[in-house]
UniProtKB/Swiss-Prot annotation:
This is Ubiquitin-related modifier 1 homolog. Acts as a sulfur carrier required for 2-thiolation of mcm(5)S(2)U at tRNA wobble positions of cytosolic tRNA(Lys), tRNA(Glu) and tRNA(Gln). Serves as sulfur donor in tRNA 2-thiolation reaction by being thiocarboxylated (-COSH) at its C-terminus by MOCS3. The sulfur is then transferred to tRNA to form 2-thiolation of mcm(5)S(2)U. Also acts as a ubiquitin-like protein (UBL) that is covalently conjugated via an isopeptide bond to lysine residues of target proteins such as Prx2/Jafrac1, Ciao1, Eip71CD and GILT1. Pathway: tRNA modification; 5-methoxycarbonylmethyl-2-thiouridine-tRNA biosynthesis. Pfam families: Urm1 (PF09138). It comes from the Eukaryota. The modification 1-thioglycine is found at G99. Transmembrane segments: none annotated.
Length: 99
């Protein structure tokens, strides 16, 4: 199968945990079923560069990180069980700000 191409975006400080890169275009193995749960594991192993505890908590995103898939709240799409589709855009927004 062809690669699964998706776009990851990080904003409002989430990019600081990923090498200060706000947008990444990924080509994932198309022979594998990619859910958000699988994607988070891949991100943790491959691109999460700073303080993973600020992004992942017990195999999901920690409270305070909003996740939008194609501009739709992931809670409406099944959260971790959502199966990624070709050209999906996954946006992570941090609401955790220091004072």
């Amino acid at each position: 199968m062809p690669d699964l191409k998706i776009i990851l975006e990080f904003s409002a400080g989430a990019e600081l945990l990923f090498g200060n890169i706000k947008r990444r275009e990924l080509a994932l193995d198309g022979d594998q079923k990619w859910t958000i749960a699988n994607l988070l594991k891949w991100m943790h192993a491959n691109i999460l560069t700073e303080r993973p505890e600020l992004f992942i908590q017990e195999s999901t995103v920690r409270p305070g990180i909003l996740v939008l898939i194609n501009d739709t709240d992931w809670e409406l799409l099944g959260e971790l069980d959502y199966e990624l589709q070709q050209n999906d855009n996954v946006l992570f927004i941090s609401t955790l700000h220091g004072g």
